[in-house]
Structures are given as C-alpha cells and as structure tokens.
Amino acid sequence: MKLKSKPKRSFGLLAAFIIAAMVGQTATAQENLPTGREAVEIQGGVYPASYFPNTEILGTDELRITALGTGMPNQTKMAVSISFFVELGNGDKFLFDIGTGSTGNLFSLRPDFSKVDKVFFSHLHVDHVGDFMGLHVGGWLSGRYDPLRIFGPSGATPELGTKAYVENMKKAYAWDLQTREGALPDAGAKLDVTEFDYMQDNEIVYQENGVTIRSWPAIHSLDGSVSYSLEWNGLKYVFGGDTYPNKWYVKHAAGADLASHEAFLPPKALATYFGWDLGQATYVSTRIHTEPAAFGKVMSAVKPRHALGYHSVLSPENYQAIVEGVRTTYDGPLTLARDLIVINVTKDYIVVRDASVDDYALPPSVTKAYVKAPRSDDKSPSDKVNAGKWDGYTPPAMPDKPTDN
C-alpha cells in the first residue's frame, strides 16, 4: 500500500532500541523496511523498526498483538479505550474488547475483515465494548460477509450479561442495519453470541483451528468480569481485562509468553489527573483496579516471558509514576502499552515496536466471496417520502452490473 500522507507513529530505530532496552526483549528491531513494502516473512528475528500494516507475513509459529486502545473511558487522541488485536500465523484473527475509539486504529491497519469476525468481551463497561456497533457495521462494510461472533460472560442476572447487551444494542441500531441490507451481504448483519458462566474457572470458551481460548473470573465493580488466555502452537497470550489482583490470574497466566494486565494510575497520580480527592482515587486505583506496585507483584508471581501493562494515559508524569511503582515489585521484561504498539511473539523472539499507519487509510480490498455473497433487495424510503424528491435534479443512469469472470 502506498501511503498518501505522512505516516504517524514512525519513530525509527532509536525508539525501537529504547523500547528494546527498556523491556529486555530477545530481539531488537532493525531499520530494514522491506523494499517497496511488499509482504515478506521476517527472518532471524530482524524486524523493521516500525510495523507497516500488510508488509509482513506472520510465520507459522508466530503471533502478533496490536494494542488498538490502552487508555481510559475519557479517551484522548493518543489513548483511546481498551482493545487488543491478535493475529496468528495460521490466518486467524481475534479481538479482545473493543472499547470506545478503538475501531479507528483497527481500520488503520487495513486487515482482511472477512477474518475479523470474533470479539471477546472481558466485561461490559463502555471503555471495553463502546465501539461494538462500529465494529459490527464497519466490518460489514469492509469485507465481513459472515455473522460477527461475540463471546462474553454472563452477569449476576440475565439482563446484566453479554447476550442481553448485544440484543439490546442491536435493537438500538435496527434502523441502521435495515438501511444497509441489500447493498451489503445479508449474513454480515447477523450476530452470533456465545455467553458463558463468568465464574467458570479456566474452562474453554473457544476451540477451533488449533486455537484454545479459556476464561476465568476477574474482580471488578460487579460480578460478570473475566480474563482470557489464548493458546496456539505452543504460545500463550493472556488478556486480563479489568481486575483487582486475583488468584485466578496468578494461577492461569503463569508462564505465559505475553501476559497483559492493567497497570492503573497510582492513587496520587489518579487524583491529580481527574481532580478527585485522594480517598476516591485510592478506592478506584486499589480496590476496583490494579495499581502499579500490585501489577508488579502479580507479574513477579506469574513470571511471563514479557509483561504488558495498560489502562492509563501515558503522559510523561503518569508514565514515570507507573514505571516507578511497577519496578518496586517486578524487575522482569516490561512494556507499558500505548496505542498502536505492536508485539511479535515466537518461541525465540519477542519484539516490541510501533505501527506506522496512514492518517487517511483507505478501506481494505474485499474478497470475491464478499462480492458474491447473497444480498436481499435494496431498501428505499416510502412512496410518501419519495414524493418529495426535487424535480430540479435528475441522477445519472445506473451503470451495468458487472458480470462474473
């Protein structure tokens, strides 16, 4: 893909080196951008300093995690709400949460949306599911011709669970869906919801194509929050969602290749950021979330190959406060995630760098299957509304429909 505007977040070799030194990764990013940005398979752990979407072929034993959103409910331009995009060398793609604002970063990667059809909710706070509608409709517009599959926990009562959330949201944008039927593949409008017991302990919620995803309870606000692990081809990624430090995460994340867990602002920094009194900030940071020193204790117990913290706004002062807190209790490999950070994981390497994306990324090309997928009749306004069309304008003739090759 030829970039049409100055790419953002391309910090070059120096930034890649700084990240490598900070986290203690086993391979450093090198300035060897593939010629012409053609898709190539990386050899010997020598990666370009920045990740350019669709220029690298994942190895058969490689996964790539992109942080689409790492911030707070009050999103900023540089830190939208929580979402992680996981791509495997077998072609499978998974979303863990889809918080408000995160779809913009997803679409900037220009993935094959026919394969972006699975999203796993950790819980139903808006900063974790707020872009659900955008994912459903935007992915449908961009190449998904099958139902969007949603996996998520039950709640303490039926109306607080994932199934009720999805059903109610679909009712809320029923008008939108009906206007697009006919122009877009019919099946892409559908939603396939799998709700599971939030208290199940490391049980399988998804198992297909050699991929196993398990869930266990998280402790956050109300009953109905979970964490996940994804295992494939001898690699393990863990997504914590939002949670107070808990025994389930420590047990089931143990030894993960990449363990992600919130590293929330410490109380004083949180009080300053929101203008709260210290009591309120302390309660939120240390009773509902996981503050940095507690994150460090969790990671010291889990001992992952690499620890990934998120759920903050990494202004210089906040970044310093979080790092200092974590390093009082954990001295292992660490990255504090910012939006569009990319982590490649193999059995030999873990490489951390930034994505370089176009501010005006075009939608990805769609597959032939998408073009040929069944569609119902186009929708239009009623006769009484159409009667109001202005006779001062005549639209151009419709082109002939393309023929199958």
Where are these regions (language model features)?
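Binuclear metal-dependent hydrolase catalytic cores
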Residues: 2, 29-237, 320-350, 367-369, ...
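Bacterial N-terminal signal peptides that target proteins for export
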Residues: 2-14
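Bacterial N-terminal signal peptides
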Residues: 12-22
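Juxtamembrane cytosolic interface motif at the C-terminal end of transmembrane helices
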Residues: 24-27
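Cap/insert and terminal regions of metallo-dependent hydrolase folds
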Residues: 30-31, 227, 233-236, 244-341
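A polyampholytic, Gly/Pro-enriched intrinsically disordered region
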Residues: 352-366
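Protein-protein interaction and targeting regions used for scaffolding, dimerization, and localization
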Residues: 372-376
